[in-house]
Amino acid sequence: MISYFSYTSSWFRDVWECRLTVEEKKHGNTDLIFPTGIACAQPSVSNSRPDVSTTTPWLAPIVWEGTYDLTVIDNIYKQQNITVAVTVFALGKYVRFLKDFLESAEQHFMVGYRVHYYLFTDRPDEVPTVTLGEGRQLTVIKTETSNRWQEISLRRMERIEKLIEKELTDKADYIFSLDVDCKFYAHWGAESLGDLVGVLHAGFFGTSREHFTYERRPESQAFIPLQEGDYYYGGAVIGGRLDKVHKLVKTCRMQLDVDRANHIEAAWQEESHLNKYFLYNKPSKLLSPEYLWDDTKGKPSYLKVVRFSQVFKKYAEVRPNP
């Protein structure tokens, strides 16, 4: 099922008129109830992945192949009857990545669950026809583009914030924001669900934090001092429950507004603000680089599977400006 609506300035107004606020939304049962009569393997008491870290210092799990039992997870989450919203931005020439993104998502992303894609694009006539599975739908949101890719990046937080407030409070339980210039190569399922979910950036995995490309200028709201920082998170994947993600994108949007008023742009736009947010608001679950790899990279021994990866592209060809 595909539906369309226009994304205009009026969509930003009168947020308080929503029938339900994000904070008031009842998320339903969040208990991890396991049904009776289901046979599964006995968990091991030893570390199943000694080659990588599987927990953070604040005891959030880092999801790797071999660290979970999908039978257990699906038996817990499928009875909750959840809906997962996915925001995708395909502005300008980035619309060319849509077909591979959607077709591969239908093969691998949250298969067996209700999924609603929300596609922001300035080229609705170029949206490809993709067969969607049962319980899965696509809404196309006509959106203004920009002649600067940096501005396109900066506006995403605001657009996700308003989408949650105006459309999703009674329509979804979880939300993921995923970059369109990526492709799914393997299973991505309910093991990725959590209150607030970030992904470890493949380019900085195993790198000391003084080499992270955090925003280092104190004038920016995204500023992180050299002696601080846990991980470097990729902005191509953000997820979690609606209320948690809403708080994240609203906070980042407010910080972006302050920076804009002060005529400063963080080093990596919304990704810089995301890293600042996650430093002081720890994610409850981290996805390993399996969930955000890069097609131009080789496959190291610790990477047992590539689930989602940025595809090769010539940025000068697809971006509206250098």
Task: Name these PLM-found stretches.
Residues 207-222:
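E2/UBC-UEV (E2-variant) core
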Residues 220-314:
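Catalytic core and acceptor-binding pocket of nucleotide-sugar-dependent glycosyltransferases
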Residues 119, 176-179, 239, 286-288:
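A structural signal for short, well-ordered beta-strand segments and their strand-loop junctions
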Residues 86, 105, 117, 160, ...:
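Structural signal for hydrophobic/aromatic residues that build the beta-strand cores
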Residues 1-155, 163-170:
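N-terminal anchoring/stem segment of glycosyltransferases
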Residues 157-208:
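GT-A fold catalytic core of metal-dependent nucleotide-sugar glycosyltransferases
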Residues 97-99, 128-131, 186-190, 297-300:
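A short acidic (Asp/Glu
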Residues 120-127, 182, 186, 292:
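Short, polar loop motifs at secondary-structure junctions
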